[in-house]
Regions:
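Short, flexible coil/linker segments at or flanking structured domains
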Residues: 2, 27, 86, 131, ...
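Beta-strand-turn-beta hairpins that frame and shape the catalytic cleft
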Residues: 1-9, 135-142
Length: 173
């Protein structure tokens, strides 16, 4: 029976490797039960802590490859639970840390395709479409990682609506 609605799922700000594994397990169970037709991973799947400009805990010794491996395993699990879903990955501000790190520390490597997020996280193999500019319009709704933050409840949504002229779904805030 054909329905006149679409099952869409939004998941923002997992921040691997600092993810909450219990919350992620609940999310996986929900994906399996809900069977969404479209999934938006709304940025900041990676934290990129190892390459951030912030002071690092020397006892942590977290490696960037560990962050990537954790994020790929999350994506693989999502894909395994729903092989038919269209999956979009919206760029977040933490993914932008990769490019900034290269610009500041290894300009000569900044143009390598192998170091682009879609290759580091194996989007092609997993059938994930990358939204590089961090925002897309999907069936009349803006979907983005977002950066607008306001002090009072509801003001962020109002500011986003005024900026974009339509309803939307934002992460980050």
């Amino acid at each position: 029976m054909k329905t006149n609605y679409e099952k869409v799922l939004f998941i923002p700000d997992i921040h691997c490797p600092f993810q909450d594994d219990k919350a992620l397990e609940v999310f996986y169970q929900f994906v399996q039960w809900f069977k969404p037709e479209t999934i938006f991973i709304m940025g900041d799947l990676l934290d990129c802590y190892a390459i951030s400009r912030f002071t690092k805990d020397p006892n942590g010794a977290l490696k960037f490859q560990e962050e990537l491996d954790t994020a790929v395993s999350v994506l693989e699990r999502i894909r395994h639970l729903n092989k038919k879903a269209k999956i979009y990955y919206i760029r977040g501000n933490h993914e932008a840390r990769i490019q900034k790190f290269l610009w500041n520390n290894a300009k000569e490597l900044s143009g390598l395709h192998a170091l682009e997020i879609e290759n580091l996280l194996d989007f092609k193999r997993l059938g994930i479409e990358y939204v590089k500019d961090g925002m897309m319009k999907y069936k009349g709704i803006i979907v983005k990682h977002g950066s607008v933050v306001r002090k009072y409840a509801g003001y962020t949504a109002k500011a986003e609506f005024e900026k974009n002229g339509c309803s939307g779904v934002s992460a980050h805030t």
